[in-house]
Amino acid sequence: MLTPIGIVIMTAYTVGMLYSVVYDKLRTPTQRVGKVLLSVGEGILLYTGSIYFVILSLSMIALSALSVLTSPSAKEYLRWELARIEAAGGKSWGVNATVAVTAGATSLGVLGLYGVMVTWGIA
């Protein structure tokens, strides 16, 4: 059974995912619609079965990383952004390393959220 804090956490996660769609520059309009549907689906699954949330989230992360790595325009845009960061005095990163680190960190965040949900008895 869900606790009130569980409902707040799950709702905040879903709203955060939907908010990120607005600022996602690497996706086409069709992909943004897909991400909205996926976010809503995740929100529903959070209420019904958290293990499905973990599987769906990790699958989405893997597919997103794969789509960036296989899209020449996405890689070029990411390369351009990384060059801007480096020109501003930031650390130099390659496209593949950036995607791998981002996917890894996001996956750890999902697993951490699931751990919190299990610990608090939400999941």
At which residue positions do the language-model features occur?
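Juxtamembrane boundary at the C-terminal end of a transmembrane helix
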Residues: V110-A123
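Short, amphipathic, aromatic/basic-enriched membrane-interface segments that mark the entry/exit
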Residues: Y19-L37
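Lipid-exposed faces of alpha-helical membrane segments in multi-pass integral membrane proteins
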Residues: V8-V15, L37-V40, S59-A62
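Short alpha-helical packing/oligomerization segments
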Residues: I44-Y77
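Hydrophobic, membrane-inserted alpha-helices
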Residues: K35-Y47
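N-terminal signal-anchor/start-transfer transmembrane helix
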Residues: P4-K25
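Short hydrophobic membrane-inserting alpha-helices and related fusion/pore-forming segments
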Residues: M1-I7, T48-S57, L108
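Interfacial loop-to-transmembrane junctions
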Residues: E81-S107
